[in-house]
Amino acid sequence: MYSDTFDLKALIRPVVDFPKPGVIFRDITPLFQSPRGLRYVADQFIERYVEADFTHIGAMDARGFLIGSIIAHQLNKPLILFRKQGKLPADVLSEGYQTEYGEAFLEVHADSLCDGDSVLIFDDLIATGGTLLAAANLVRRTGAKVFEAAAIIDLPELEGSRRLQAAGVPTFCLTEFSLSEY
């Protein structure tokens, strides 16, 4: 276990004007280049959820897969992949949503979940909440329930966490950034 003074934000690189002017992109690749940082992040989520009552972990394409798979492995939970449109080979459920950059579609295999399942949905970052709201809608369409939405980073000024909570989805993030914070 690491001390409370571990500086997670130091491992999240701000990239100005990416993918478009005026945006500060939060690049988590330095986190994956730090064994200590990656262990810290994984341990924080594992400690939070080790005794939680859910059946599956749903990870968002693509950066959500990276930590989501570690958490699923450590907690011995099935991992459900929520992919961008056209990436899954079998029958899918699809949900459209708005991102901070435009419109997109999220898909999940139609047979991934069923009544009685409870899913922790995971992504690297909550901005507008569009991706995780689409995932929550897909989970509910299968008859399953959303346990919680979790992410490494929250951008509270974009109100994604608020939108998720208003839709009945509790949220948890390890850290947050203001839109102007470097």
UniProtKB/Swiss-Prot annotation:
GO terms for cellular component: cytosol. Keywords: Cytoplasm, Glycosyltransferase, Purine salvage, Transferase. It catalyses: AMP + diphosphate = 5-phospho-alpha-D-ribose 1-diphosphate + adenine. Pathway: Purine metabolism; AMP biosynthesis via salvage pathway; AMP from adenine: step 1/1. One of its GO terms (biological process) is AMP salvage. Coiled coil: none annotated. It is found in: Cytoplasm. GO terms for molecular function: adenine phosphoribosyltransferase activity. The keyword Protease does not apply. Pfam families: Pribosyltran. InterPro entries: Ade_phspho_trans, Adenine_PRTase, PRibTrfase_dom, PRTase-like. Its EC number is 2.4.2.7. Belongs to the purine/pyrimidine phosphoribosyltransferase family. Homodimer. Catalyzes a salvage reaction resulting in the formation of AMP, that is energically less costly than de novo synthesis. PANTHER family: ADENINE PHOSPHORIBOSYLTRANSFERASE, PHOSPHORIBOSYLTRANSFERASE DOMAIN-CONTAINING PROTEIN. This is Adenine phosphoribosyltransferase.
